[in-house]
Design a protein with these regions (language model features):
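ATP/NTP phosphate-donor binding region
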Residues: 1-26
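Internal helical hairpin/lid segments
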Residues: 144-177
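Short glycine/serine/threonine-rich phosphate/pyrophosphate-binding segments
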Residues: 37-40, 64-68, 164
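Conserved anion/nucleotide-ligand pocket segment
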Residues: 76-141
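Structural motif
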Residues: 29-31, 59, 152-154
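Short, acidic/small-residue loops that bind anionic groups at enzyme active sites
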Residues: 46-70, 78-85
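N-terminal glycine-rich "phosphate-gripper" loop used for MgATP/nucleotide binding
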Residues: 31-40, 45
């Protein structure tokens, strides 16, 4: 892999890689090996015409959120916010994560259950949108800003200070997100 400062190559190199995978009709899924900052720098330059004719899965999380939201809002294409190959060998990443991802990629229903930290007596359902809160926040006001009306907004973040999270959530609330 090439490097360019904090990036996995120059913007044009990374754009060429994602474009090649997007255009190739033999590629049925793109598994991002890691999050890595920089997708938001190129996401609006990806030519999505081939993808609209031949949809495929894009899988990843963290900074890949910008790609997920762009695909969803601009193309109406679903993607999968899921574990990346870099983490498959991590003992904290159970085989269940991988198996569930494969089921989702095959089109099988994958129910999501969650035990809230306190007792709750309600059931929710709806379209799920979201991802890394820093990326959601940075895409506010762009064509990739998620539609949250009637949706279940999920957010993830690692190591962010509470006051940063509060600032982002407050801004998102004030802008109607």
């Amino acid at each position: 892999f090439t490097r360019n400062g904090p990036f996995a190559g120059r913007d044009d190199e990374r754009l060429e890689d994602i474009q090649r995978a997007t255009d190739d009709p033999e590629v049925r899924a793109v598994l991002c090996s890691r999050g890595g900052y920089g997708m938001s720098r190129i996401v609006d330059r990806i030519d999505l015409r081939a993808l609209k004719r031949n949809p495929k899965w894009y899988v990843g999380y963290s900074d890949i959120t910008s790609l997920h939201l762009w695909l969803n809002k601009v193309c109406g294409i679903a993607s999968l916010h899921a574990e990346m190959p870099l983490n498959y060998s991590d003992p904290a990443c159970s085989p269940q994560y991988y198996e569930t991802m494969v089921r989702a990629l095959r089109g099988d229903a994958v129910p999501v259950t969650w035990t809230p930290p306190r007792e709750a007596s309600f059931v929710v359902s709806g379209v799920v949108t979201g991802g890394n809160i820093s990326l959601i926040y940075s895409l506010n006001g762009t064509p990739a800003q998620p539609d949250t009306g009637g949706a279940i907004l999920f957010i993830e973040e690692i190591g962010e200070q509470f006051y940063h999270l509060d600032r982002m959530l407050t801004s998102m609330r004030m802008t109607g997100m």
